Each structure stands twice: as C-alpha cells, then as structure tokens.
Regions:
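Glycine-enriched alpha-helix->loop->beta-strand junction motifs that scaffold or abut catalytic
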Residues: 31, 62-65, 96, 174-181, ...
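C-terminal amphipathic alpha-helical "assembly" element
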Residues: 1-32, 101, 182-184, 188-199, ...
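Internal, glycine-rich beta/alpha segment that forms the wall or movable "lid"
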Residues: 78-178, 189-196, 200, 204-209
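N-terminal beta1-alpha1-beta2 module of alpha/beta enzyme domains
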Residues: 1-67, 158
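Active-site mouth loops of central-metabolism enzymes
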Residues: 5-18, 71-83, 154-164, 219-226
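A short, GP-enriched loop/loop-strand-helix hinge that lies immediately N-terminal to
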Residues: 67-71, 101
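Glycine-rich, proline-tolerant flexible connector loops at the mouths of alpha/beta enzymes
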Residues: 34-59, 74-76, 108-113, 183-189, ...
C-alpha cells in the first residue's frame, strides 16, 4: 500500500511555502510516494480553488522522485474548459518529468443531468492528450481541429482519479474507468462499501473505456501511534492501494507534520 501526504491549499492555516518544501523534501528522502495538493472545502461543502496547480509547479522544481497529485475541483464543462486543464496538467507533468497524478473533485453529488457533461469533459481531456490534433463534435460542444499543447510526459497521459465521498461517486469512478480516491473520512465499513461499489462498477465496463489502472485510495487522519499502525494494517488487509495522510492545518504545526511523515515512512508502519 502506497503512503502519501495530503495538503489542503487555500485554508487559513495553509503552511508557508518554504515550510511545505521542507516537509515534502523530508518525505521524498524517506520514500513517501506522493504529495497531494487539494483545494480546501468551505462550510457549504464547495471547494475553494486555492491554486494547487501553482504550488505543484513550484514543488516540481524542488523535488526529484516524489509524485505530485493535483486535486482539481469542478471538472464539469463549460464551467472549467477541459482545454485549459489539459494544458496546465501537461505543463506540470513536463516540468516534473512525468510525476503528475490528477484527481477530479465534484463540487457536489453528481446529479443525473450533470453526468453526461462530466463524462464528456473527461473524454475530451483524455483525447486532447492522446490525439496529435484535437477536434470534437457533440450536442453540447463543437471544437474545430486545434493543436492542444504541450502534451504530457507520461504516455498516454497522467493517471486520472475521481475523488469522492459516497458510493455513488465510487460507482461513477468505476463506470468512467478511473481510479477512485475516497475522501469521506468514513469508518472501515463505509470505506469497504465504497470500495465494493467501485470494483463492481468497473468490472462491468468495456476494457476499451478504461482511462486509468484500477486503484482505490483513502484520505484520512492518522496519528503517529500504535493505533495508527493497527489502522494501516487493517486498510492494507482490506485491499486499499494508497493511503493519504493530512499534514496541513495541524494543531502541532510543522513539528507534528514532520512527525506524521516520519511515522508514515517508518518500518513499523510498512506492514508488508
């Protein structure tokens, strides 16, 4: 099971950039897999942008191995044009020499009338990366032939996730051929329910529609303690592929963040 970090960008307690750099470089030295930057959520559940992509662009030049995860809110065209996302993501992937992961964050439950636009946005994004020259015609959009550059370093494209907090989100990730990142913070029973919804939905789709490899990750709180070790053992035994541990906006600040990073990378926490 991969071990990764989660920063929420845009919150009042967002760390100073040099502090974050120090923490991420420590994580890279200790073998942590990915650092994810997500926008913070408001009281109404909507996401504040917070410009995670800018933070990741800066991290790309200050790190060498650790992968860079971008949590992108509101990927429902035309509110966020897929072409701009394709360009920004490819630029980060190039500057990091192929280390980008992209997780799409719904602003709310995916309503039935939004599903077609959301699915179409994902397909447009993938085609912009894959095709030498992009064009698109549908009842919603008409895009004449255009060069979408740059292209990402990873082929055919960076791994794509749907981040969500319900069984419906998990099923949408499976049906869309994406990886799924559970940000519900639920109990193990809830996490397993979401995982099973994802696995069942993904098993029923055409292999040609798979966008990314099957993967199910969870974002969580985790203290450096024996209880934390037991929780990691439990999640790994349940078959989760990646765990993201929050290291921003902690009561203990930078010291607590470094403690969590060292714990996550320790031999005690690496079960198998």
């Amino acid at each position: 099971m991969k071990r990764s970090l989660l920063y929420q960008i845009g919150a009042a307690e967002t760390p100073e950039f040099e502090t974050m750099i120090e923490e991420v470089q420590l994580a890279e030295t200790l073998g942590i897999d990915t650092v994810w930057c997500f926008p913070s959520a408001g009281e109404d559940g909507s996401f504040r942008d917070g410009a995670p992509s800018i933070w990741l662009s800066a991290l790309a030049s200050r790190t060498e191995r650790i992968r860079l995860g971008w949590g992108l809110a509101g990927m429902t065209p035309p509110s966020r044009p897929p072409m701009r996302v394709a360009e920004q993501a490819a630029a980060i992937d190039l500057s990091s020499e192929g280390r980008l992961e992209l997780a799409l964050l719904p602003d709310a439950e995916l309503r039935q009338d939004d599903e077609g636009a959301w699915d179409e946005g994902v397909r447009m994004l993938v085609d912009m990366w894959d095709a030498p020259r992009f064009s698109w015609t549908s009842p919603r959009f008409t895009v004449p032939p255009v060069d979408v550059v740059p292209k990402p370093a990873q082929h055919p494209h960076p791994p794509l996730w749907l981040a969500g907090w319900s069984a419906e989100h998990a099923a949408r990730a499976g049906e869309g051929g994406l990886a799924f990142l559970d940000i519900s913070g639920g109990t193990d029973q809830t996490l397993v329910l979401h995982r099973d919804a994802y696995t069942e939905a993904r098993a029923g789709i055409d292999p040609n529609d798979l966008v990314s490899m099957a993967s199910c990750g969870i974002a969580t709180e985790l203290d450096a303690s024996p209880d934390g070790v037991e929780r990691l053992i439990g999640w790994e035994d349940l078959g989760f592929d990646e765990v993201l541990v929050r290291v921003s906006s902690l009561e203990g600040g930078h010291a607590e963040a470094c403690e969590r990073i060292r714990f996550l990378a320790s031999e005690d926490a690496r079960v198998h």
